[in-house]
């Protein structure tokens, strides 16, 4: 049975072109870029070239604004904690209730350390209120950290507007966006619409580079203290020997993503939309989370009422289909998704969510297979539910109401 991988918001297959670009730096040009001999200077040039290419793809004014890290979690920690250390006289942070744990938990840690953190709510579609955002800005606000696209629902926040409103209110406020899910999928122009963004995080393994490499954009003039201290690497902003093969792979992956982005975006959106329509037509009592909000072209998050998501995922896996119930970083937890709770998803559905996320390697045949098996999986699980009337194929009266208090 062929595996159908539909969990690309969790991680992606390394592109063959990326793998090929990395190979020489494992066994031939394996030198430390900080060393002084000629071969090492060659690997230093590889890092410099990767930095230039990534800066160009993102519209950064200066390659030195690109800081290489090990992952988006490190990039987010560096951005948030680095900004906090560099601006000790300001103690207020603004974020949202639906951030990835790599941002949310850092903000909660700052809160425990005495910072005042505002967690902005979202509406039932996952949208932020611009007026509520502006009201949250204060004279002591040091940082705004708002994701570009949500990893669970795919809902896209208006970072262009949010960053502009921030700078119009107070140019000294640092604006950070976690663009892990959007870089390579959506346009990101740090010299254009994103020109008010000071810090931007992303990760290689979400755009067909390997796990273990990420980057942080740091706009010139942004006050930020280093998160990792030691050597002089990365302009003394991030200590540690550069991971040359992975950095080369990251640059190649971003090149590929941007070269094919518009065509990939259109084709992948068609796959997503086709699956969405089939699910809505074939499964009763299902809702598409974020359906009417701007969304990533590859992401579909559905909640099936009166079904446990864990059961759906196990049965999908038995059919060779890889999907998710939310962030892979918290998938070991039995707690319901904080993102769906923030959207106000009903009790009967919040535990029954499944996320399908596609990439350039998915096909019409993949979607055909999911459409064939997923409705039947939901139907089979509902037969076991005390809240579902199997004869009428509808919820029982007052289904689930007695369990809301638990």
Placement of each model-derived feature along the sequence:
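Pyridoxal 5′-phosphate
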Residues: 1-406
């Amino acid at each position: 049975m062929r595996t159908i991988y539909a969990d690309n918001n969790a991680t992606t297959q390394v592109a063959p072109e990326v793998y090929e670009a990395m190979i020489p730096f494992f066994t031939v040009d394996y030198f430390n870029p900080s060393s002084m001999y000629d071969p090492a200077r060659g690997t230093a040039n590889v890092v410099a070239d990767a930095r230039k290419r990534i800066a160009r793809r993102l519209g950064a004014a200066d390659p030195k604004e690109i800081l290489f890290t090990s992952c988006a979690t490190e990039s987010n920690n560096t951005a948030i904690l680095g900004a906090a250390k560099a601006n000790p006289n300001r103690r207020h942070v603004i974020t949202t209730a639906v951030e990835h744990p790599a941002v949310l938990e850092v903000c909660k840690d700052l809160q425990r350390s005495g910072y005042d953190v505002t967690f902005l709510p979202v509406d039932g579609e996952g949208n932020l209120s611009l007026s509520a955002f502006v009201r949250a800005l204060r004279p002591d606000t040091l940082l705004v950290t708002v994701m570009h696209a949500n990893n669970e629902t795919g809902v896209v926040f208006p970072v262009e507007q949010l960053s502009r409103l921030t700078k119009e209110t107070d140019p000294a406020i640092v604006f950070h966006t976690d663009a892990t899910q959007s870089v390579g999928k959506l346009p990101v122009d740090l010299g254009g619409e994103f020109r008010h963004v000071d810090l931007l995080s992303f990760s290689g393994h979400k755009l067909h580079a390997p796990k273990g490499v990420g980057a942080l954009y740091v706009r010139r003039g942004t006050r930020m203290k280093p998160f990792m201290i030691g050597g002089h690497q990365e302009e003394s902003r991030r200590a540690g020997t550069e991971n040359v093969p992975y950095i080369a792979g990251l640059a190649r992956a971003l090149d590929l993503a941007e070269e094919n982005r518009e065509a990939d975006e259109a084709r992948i959106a068609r796959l997503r939309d086709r699956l969405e329509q089939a699910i809505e037509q074939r499964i009763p009592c299902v809702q598409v989370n974020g359906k009417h909000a701007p969304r990533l072209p590859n992401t579909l998050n559905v909640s099936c009422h009166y079904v446990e998501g864990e059961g759906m995922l196990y049965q999908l896996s038995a059919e060779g289909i890889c999907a998710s119930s939310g962030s892979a970083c918290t998938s070991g937890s039995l707690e319901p998704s904080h993102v769906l709770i923030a959207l106000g998803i009903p009790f009967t559905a919040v535990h029954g969510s499944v996320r399908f996320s596609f990439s350039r390697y998915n096909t019409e045949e993949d979607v055909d297979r999911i459409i064939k098996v997923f409705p039947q999986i939901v139907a089979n699980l509902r037969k076991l539910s005390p809240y579902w009337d199997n004869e009428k194929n509808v919820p029982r009266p007052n289904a689930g109401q007695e369990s809301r208090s638990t």
